[in-house]
Amino acid sequence: MIKTAETYHVPVLLKQSIDGLDIKSGGIYIDVTFGGGGHSREILKRINGNGHLYSFDQDEDAEKNVNNIIAELSNDNDTTSTEHNCGLTFVRSNFRYLKNWMRYYDIDHIDGLLADLGVSSHHFDDETRGFSFRFDGPLDMRMNKRAGMTAADVVNEYEEEALADIFYLYGELKTSRRIAAAIIKARDIKKIETTQDFIKAVEPLFKREREKKDMAKLFQALRIEVNHEMDALKEMLLSATELLDKGGRLSVITYHSLEDRIVKNIMKTGNAEGKMKQDFFGRIETPFKLINNKVIIPDEEEQLKNPRSRSAKLRIAEKR
């Protein structure tokens, strides 16, 4: 069997998230976070040629894994296998454009959508991408290498107040203003171009016992800003809400409180702010029925096998 690129993380909560889709014969499904293809592979196995899967990823590295999936699921003697005849269409795009792409493919309803919002091990472990403070490399952080703005652009060009807001809102760091001031001071001396340049500028502000946690939050905040992650997530989930048929399922895995709050609010109220809507008679209107009232988390065995799954939370909802 041809393996998916080993640099991508092991699919988190694989069985629970796919079970949550309640896959039906002939259904149309979407995996908006293809990555190494782990979740897509399982969906395709359950569709078993009777239905279709649209898989999204904006990273060109992820696209290289598509042929592996096709080879695994196709007859070894079939040399003409393609994405289409194994029930898969790969879309190299940010998932925020979900509705546009479905219109392009003339799809006006779907039966289920899965999103695994975690940054893959592939990104964290590649020093050339700049996602991790463990390596020295270009301060990049773009999920889509074709996108314009890098993390270096953010730290070198944003005003001090804007930087402070990013670190406070997306990193939930109480020392955001001090961090922003330290960056301004450092870049006045020398342009911040690498992860180590950035770390040197802010490291003195962190207490030793919290240094790794706070540095991770700081890198998270920059990554979210560079990739417009919160806006993209809101747009994708609202599009999914429109596209899902009655009884269709939404299965979403989150890894930090900011994205989890958005997912929870949209599943409960239909909007990212969590504002309850009422009809003419004062009855609360909600687009979804929650399948799990409490979040599903990896069990101890999965957390031991895959430490990066520890912060994962799965929420599942069904369209009313």
Where are these regions (language model features)?
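S-adenosyl-L-methionine-dependent methyltransferase catalytic core, i.e., the SAM/SAH-binding region
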Residues: 1-320
